[in-house]
Amino acid sequence: MPAGVSSLSPDSTMCERIEHDLIGELALPADCPWGIHTERARRNFALGGGPVPERLIRAYALVKKACCLANAELGHLPQDVAAALAAACDDIAAGRQAEAFPLDALQGGAGTSTNMNLNEVLANLALDRLGRPRGAWQVVHPLDHVNLHQSTNDTYPTALKVAAILALRDASAAFQALQGALQRREQAFAAIAAIGRTEGMPAVPMTLGQMFGAWAEAAARDLWRTFKCEERLRVVNLGGTAVGNGLAAPRD
């Protein structure tokens, strides 16, 4: 049987599906959300480094959705498949499919296994929505549909940047809250005398409000730094595919 395909077990209970790749075949539970590539990676890279961070998985789903919508808009994906895939991406981005991502964060291939985990799970979730059995890759294929015009080498770095941006926005909100709290104390303590210290020794008089004002300025500078970091992270290589020249991706 050709690589990257699956078939239901002839067993009358239909409790397994058989998936094939260039190495051979594996039996998976019929309702398993991932496929043969993820299962091989799960077995090969059981290194104990902890799971792939959920934030990265959720960010990767957003990248996959963007690619899906772009391919559909350009006519490269059937509309029903694109709609099912986009909805599946939303499920993962919302954190509703965490159990479908079993891989260790320490893995070979610079993210290839994680990319294939996303591709296979998204394909199966889309098949669920289309009323087809999981593993029916002739209907929704992990590579031919989910990973269309993409590579691990452009989607994985993009997902990392999206995850970093989302984390930075959490940090930005925290810095804003901290700055506001310090500024309120600056006003409340404006008339309270204090001693400024240098080298841990009493130095010159100041107010407690001035101390809190200085801390508020430090928080403001850190907030500005998060904004500048996000600006740089917005530049991504999506569309570059495997080596950056966009091979196998249409120019339109």
Region locations from a protein language model:
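Conserved, well-structured ligand/cofactor-binding cores
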Residues: P2-D252
